[in-house]
Amino acid sequence: MLGHRLLPSLDFPAVSEGYKPEHDMSPNKDASSLNSSAAGLVCLPPVSEELQLVWTQAIQTSELDGNEHLLQAFSYFPYPSLADIALLCLRHGLQMEKVKTWFMAQRLRCGISWSSEEIEETRARVVYHRDQLLFKSLLSFTQQSVRPPQERPPVLRPEQVALGLSPLAPSEQPTHMKGLKVEPEEPSQVSQLPLNHQNAKEPLMMGSRTFSHQSDCQDLQISGLSKEQAGRGPDQSCGKTASWNHFTAVHQPDKPASVSLLDNSCKEESEPSGIPPSSSTSSPSFQALANGTTATPKPLQPLGCISQSLSPSKKALSPQVEPLWPQRLWNNSEPNSAGPTEYLSPDMQHQRKTKRKTKEQLAILKSFFLQCQWARREDYHKLEQITGLPRPEIIQWFGDTRYALKHGQLKWFRDNAVLGTPSFQDPAIPTPSTRSLKEWAKTPPLPAPPPPPDIRPLEKYWAAHQQLQEADILKLSQASRLSTQQVLDWFDSRLPKPAEVVVCLDEEDEEDEEDELPEDGEEEEEEEEDDDDGDDDVIIWD
């Protein structure tokens, strides 16, 4: 008897493939929405404890739906830690087991199924935006508008337009479903659902801010929520509708078969749709998702297959439909189009150009990582003060280092790790080697780097005087933050180079010297002749 009231587990195809109710996904429902019997039991899959199943009463999963504090916590992050749940219970007088059960039920209602690694990665990204409720679109704090749901005009999603789907008439729209229970009387429906678990990770179309207050739950019925929602932009959150097509074909038997044939005929045309490629880093995309605004779609008309005259880059969108993502994220590949071609804004491009960390900064980060691999918010704040690095770079460094450690690529950690400490810590298990915040508070911050030299005072002085005075050397050295020798060298480089002097001997001087040499020789010859004459004058008498 209990088998008729079971919710599918985490690995059940109905949940893992984006199985969602047709209309009402809001947690503000009666207890009977999960189970028609108050004494019925449901099976909830937790995150930890090796995915063991939790059995609980169906009424406990919805009795806290009116608690605004829990709705606020779920809007901030759908996977709160045990410490966050305990703090909620202490502040608002709640029972911890009921709160944990409530969060499990909300994740199932919204089709959320993340792994533990994805939870930690997304939590590290959401920590920058503590004031923004990124998951508020899944909840509804206000009641539906006065107009009944059956009188509202059906709204087409871009996926429906790309596949040529027409809106359903009020008589053709499916009825409300009672929770997420699966009746065993229809095993063929469950077996026809896709078996690929990766389709459960389709991101939610969060581009429009009207989800949380004005739009009905039909806007959320064709999309699931995954951790890529916080790290990827809205430009990547459309274009895949396999799970929705299966859901439409299985759970709408009264719908004409022409729609299914139309889906198959248009599938080949919608595959080469020009969806902008994702960027290599997730932090800029996350900011674009959190801060970006989107265009409101215009009223649509029933459309068939898109004509072949459209370019392949625009087959996924009709000319009458405005895209749900910002136009600056759309890469228009046609040469004649006038749209922007850059994905990233100047702020995002500036964030990519991060400076290299100094040896002192890396030493402080490594010393903390050796003690604790999962830093808290207070630790990030203190490390930000000590190292002078921005918090996003610190958190990114911790994430990359944990990834390298998990895959055995961290040699310095193995060389310096304390004996007896595990190679990879579980963030939920505190260790005695964790360094407390008081110890880190004693660490003095790194000295600020000296400012770069400024030669503008030297240029002004040179333009005014054109010569360096010895009395002004010290003053110029202080103003330019250069040493006195550097100031002298700078002014020496400005002085004009001395002219080269070439000494040339005149030809007249050379001739005079040549004339003097023969005169000396003639005097010597005259002296020799005089000596000879003296010898001839000697007379010998006998």
Curated annotation (Swiss-Prot):
Compartments reported by the entry: Nucleus
Pfam families: Homez
Pro residues composition-biased segments: 444-454
Position of sequence motif Nuclear localization signal: 352-357
Biased composition (Polar residues): 286-296
Gene: Homez
Protein name, as recorded: Homeobox and leucine zipper protein Homez
Tissue expression per record: Ubiquitous. Strongly expressed in testis.
Quaternary organization: Homodimer or heterodimer (Potential). Interacts with HOXC8.
Organism from which the protein derives: Mus musculus (Mouse)
UniProtKB keywords: DNA-binding, Homeobox, Isopeptide bond, Nucleus, Phosphoprotein, Repeat, Transcription, Transcription regulation, Ubl conjugation
GO cellular component, one term: nucleus
Residues carrying Phosphothreonine: T443
Role noted for this protein: May function as a transcriptional regulator.
Domain of life: Eukaryota
Annotated crosslink Glycyl lysine isopeptide (Lys-Gly) (interchain with G-Cter in SUMO2) location: K181, K201
Bias-annotated ranges (Low complexity): 272-285
DNA-binding region: 55-114, 349-409, 443-502
Acidic residues bias locations: 505-542
PANTHER family: HOMEOBOX AND LEUCINE ZIPPER PROTEIN HOMEZ, ZINC-FINGERS AND HOMEOBOXES RELATED
Listed GO MF terms: DNA binding
Modified residue annotations for Phosphoserine: S345
